Amino acid sequence: MPSTLDGITVLDLSTGPSAALTTMFLSDHGARVIRVLAPDAPLHRAGGFIIWDRGKECVRLDFDDKAKFQGLIAGADILVEDFAPSSSHQKLVERDALAKINPRLINCSITAYGKRGPLKDEPPLDDLVLARMGVLGGLPGFRPAPVHLVHPLPSV
């Protein structure tokens, strides 16, 4: 039986849980997901990646190999990344450059605070994101102060 996303190819450049989970769900719905890792990156950086990488193909790519990266971009329908605006990899995913290679590419960027604005370079630490959302002050606990949320809710 065909799946919703049969025939769709997704490039996964995730470095954290938000983008990894996003591409996991796309894979669950039938997309071909290609997880792109640097040659020296560990396959699973944290325990969750063992699950979040299910159903994905994995390729190791030196991002200096522009021809290979552009080949992946040319064959993709969707690119999912979570690079911080200050990341050295940010230049790889500039929309204008990608559009020249593949004008139909959908570029999905998942960041804690967006690519522009005063908080764009803030680290995406769960407690900071929760505090800015106003969630920590509303959590129940046995003390009058905010309670640390163990589950990384903002990351997902």
Q: Positions of the model-derived regions?
A:
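Short glycine-/small-residue-rich Rossmann-like dinucleotide-binding loops
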Residues: T15, F63, A84-P85, T111-A112, ...
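Phosphate-coordination loops involved in phosphoryl transfer and adenosine-cofactor binding
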Residues: L5-G7
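PLP-dependent aminotransferase-like
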Residues: L21-F63, L72-G75
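Basic/polar N-terminal segments that are highly enriched at the extreme N-terminus
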Residues: M1-S3
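Active-site loop-to-helix junction immediately N-terminal to the catalytic Tyr of the SDR YXXXK motif
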Residues: S18
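Conserved beta-strand elements of the Class I
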Residues: T9-L11, I34
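Active-site-adjacent "lid/gating" segments in soluble enzymes
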Residues: F25, H29, H89-V156
